[in-house]
């Protein structure tokens, strides 16, 4: 008999390696709902409340806190304990004045990086692609599954791999960061995950091979990574704080 619908369960041993959870303490893990991020690059909101920040001891306590609307993601109240919170998302707790940005660390684990209240209103969004829509508009599609409409006359200001600094929750574009030589990038995946620096060279390959970028870190060391792993976060220097 065929399976009906998506999977609803997840064993802890099979959970993504990017999650900071105990693997052998319990059998089951919370499976994130389909949403803005895929399972590998996000973590359920319940684990942020309970395991990361320690505001609850049990899943029941964590769900109660979320149902009271005490946690915001990108400036919006989120009550679904399975909501996937991913890279560059901002988690805010108004009652305590805490703000965090979700970023990977050097071993590929998703961590909460403390940020200021002012920075909590800024979210970098990497452009995955763009498409024409009705009404002489162009739709920008971002890495977190969201999109934004711009006038057709502005389409040449936005290209794939560019980063848009978005004001949240208003969803207003504040600045566009081109993917070019000299741009400051943060590596989100691969063996050089969480390293940062300036782009020295962009190597393009034919026949469908992925493009590679050479980056110079703050110590002057050069390293290569795939273009899709390099997330532009500034021009001469980063526009957001990084670990």
From Swiss-Prot:
InterPro entries: KOW (IPR005824), Rib_uL2_dom2 (IPR014722), Ribosomal_eS4 (IPR000876), Ribosomal_eS4_central_region (IPR013845), Ribosomal_eS4_central_sf (IPR038237), Ribosomal_eS4_KOW (IPR041982), Ribosomal_eS4_N (IPR013843), Ribosomal_eS4_N_CS (IPR018199)
Domain (S4 RNA-binding) ranges: 43-105
Pfam families named in the record: Ribosomal_S4e, RS4NT, S4
GO molecular function: rRNA binding; structural constituent of ribosome
GO cellular component, as recorded: cytosolic small ribosomal subunit
Keyword terms, alphabetized: Ribonucleoprotein, Ribosomal protein, RNA-binding, rRNA-binding
GO biological process: translation
Protein family according to the UniProt entry: Belongs to the eukaryotic ribosomal protein eS4 family.
NCBIfam families assigned to the protein according to its UniProt record, in alphabetical order: PRK04313.1
Name of protein: Small ribosomal subunit protein eS4
The species this protein was found in: Pyrococcus horikoshii (strain ATCC 700860 / DSM 12428 / JCM 9974 / NBRC 100139 / OT-3)
Taxonomic path: Archaea, Methanobacteriati, Methanobacteriota, Thermococci, Thermococcales
